[in-house]
Curated annotation (Swiss-Prot):
The gene is brf2. Its main location: nucleus. The modification Cysteine sulfenic acid (-SOH) is found at residue 342. General activator of RNA polymerase III transcription. Factor exclusively required for RNA polymerase III transcription of genes with promoter elements upstream of the initiation sites. Contributes to the regulation of gene expression; functions as activator in the absence of oxidative stress. Down-regulates expression of target genes in response to oxidative stress. Overexpression protects cells against apoptosis in response to oxidative stress. Keywords: Activator, Metal-binding, Nucleus, Oxidation, Repeat, Transcription, Transcription regulation, Zinc, Zinc-finger. GO terms for molecular function: RNA polymerase II general transcription initiation factor activity; RNA polymerase III type 3 promoter sequence-specific DNA binding; TBP-class protein binding; zinc ion binding. The keyword Transcription applies. This is Transcription factor IIIB 50 kDa subunit. Sequence repeats lie at residues 173-249. It is found in: Nucleus.
Amino acid sequence: MSGAKRCPDCGSSEIVEDAHYSQDQLVCADCGCILSEGLITTTVSEETSLQAVRYSDSTGENDSVTYCMKRGIIRVRDLCRVLRLPDGFVDTALSYYKQAVGLPLYRLVSIEKKEIIVGCCVYITCRQQQWPITMGTICSLIYAKKELFASLFMDIVQVLKVDVPSISLQNLVKSHCRSFKLFKDSSEVPPQYAEKLDTVSERTVQTVELAYETWLVTGRHPIPMITAAAYISWQSFQPSRRLSCSLSRFCKLSDVDMPPPSTIRLKELQETLIKLAYHLPWLKILSLNRKNIVQHLGDLLKHRALLLRRALAVTEAELSKGTEASSSTDQLNSTLVFLPPCVSNPKKRSRSIAFPCGDLDITGDEEISDSEIEQYLRTPAEMKDYQQVQSCISSV
């Protein structure tokens, strides 16, 4: 800083030297006026003594962007554009991506994992902003394996130390219902199959909430259950015209993919509705099945809180009696009305050797027969040692 000179414009004495490329110049720190510019080199000696300054060094852009990061940034923006996310989401996703790629842990990973990192950063942003989207949707867009995506997602959340809230089920249901073509005002939809989006979404939300309260959603992918609930809700408005339409045809007319577990979720949901229907007085006298239960969906959803309390009260009353029938699996399922599917229908575990009846309680103190011991004696040395031990025991 030079105290003798003053700025001719503002009179300030705050004069600093600023290096502009290879030339030095005096600049006023207050108003930015240039007092003197550096001289251009005119002699050979001056040109040989000076060194060229790179543009990145002179402008402060020392951090070079690699090809992989440039490609990843483009992929993040493309994925956000496909999902039609707001501009603020794009900036947040790019920030997370740059932080993740800059870590040594993800610097030398495979191309497949780098693509999954792009999806994870976008998915984290959507979850934080309560944007209804599932992990399966991201995986289908980037052609990634769900298991690998889930493991990398958990790792990135822990490494970046970000808070990821849970998905709002109501928003997810409404967002998924918007993708059904039958719920849109379109001339291509048959009149008997067309339905208003708001009406179907409201009933679908109530049906999914009922499934959640009866353990049909916990620990499972939500999209198959939402698809089954939307199908039942759509049928319930005009049962006479829509009962003949199958779930696969419904998804085909709606121009959406049918997840494979949707048929199983539909069956479970119908069985749950039948169990609840037996607690309504005007439905007890009817012969209900999986086909005609849809006609009474509105009544079941209207009185679902009362029906769930009655079902729980009946279950507690039967359990308090201590009936001997509780040991039977079939009668157990009829007594305990609502259980998680993993408890009501457990998968059979394969066993290499079946245990004989009555020998399930193994303590480790059982006697070992001589023939079984001989199976473990393979070499002559082991036989000799065994004979010596037996002789010592007999001599004692």
